[in-house]
Amino acid sequence: MTGIQRRMARLLANGGKLFLAAFDHPQIYGTMEGLENTPELVKSLKDSEVDGFILNPGMFERICPKAVDDKVLVLRGSVGGTMLGTVYSDVHYGMASAELAAKLDADAVLVMFVIGGSKDMESEIELARVCEEYHKLGIPVIAEVLAADYTRNNDTEVVASGARIAAELGADMIKAFYCPDFEKVTSNCPVPVILAGGPKDADIVSVVKEVVSKGAVGLAFGRNIFQSKDIRKTIGELDGALRK
């Protein structure tokens, strides 16, 4: 078994499904309600139903893996500017080396893949490059598909095409936003697909049930979790929707 195969098996060890809590938002937004103390939040959820966490390099290094028992740890490996920037970036660049990911013993690395912008080809080249670099050290890559035109992030054609393109360029798993015909995303993608959360949604449990019925193998939610009034209850409901 290769390093990639071993890590992919670990990602999907819980019945072939993956439930990630995404706490990487401050890389873009800085201060965020609910993420005032990420290390303590992670530790408080070590016995919850979540399978693991998505963290930026700085927080990743501050959280001892032993403190979160057997949870999966995914390293955020790309950057596209902050909320204070004057333009939306058409390309997200790798900022965490494969050596760093290996040193931290990351189970996978998450990178953003922006499609349809003025630097579309550059974005493709960057994704292919980082996939090659991480694969050299046996580390899987999760590509999160983003539309350069943010209003199209829920467009079926954009999501399905972006997922397939990312897989063709080397991604081992896709993180994709909800779209009406989600089965088109999963049926055309040769690698596992998990659902991206996005803004808080009162009916998000129903959305999870729908995408799982259409082939999604997991979810990676942030604000729906860390800004929930009852985090444990929300996690339990989402886990139930994912696994039943």
Question: Where are each of the predicted segments found?
Answer:
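A short, acidic, flexible beta-alpha connecting loop/helix-capping segment that sits on the rim
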Residues: 223-229
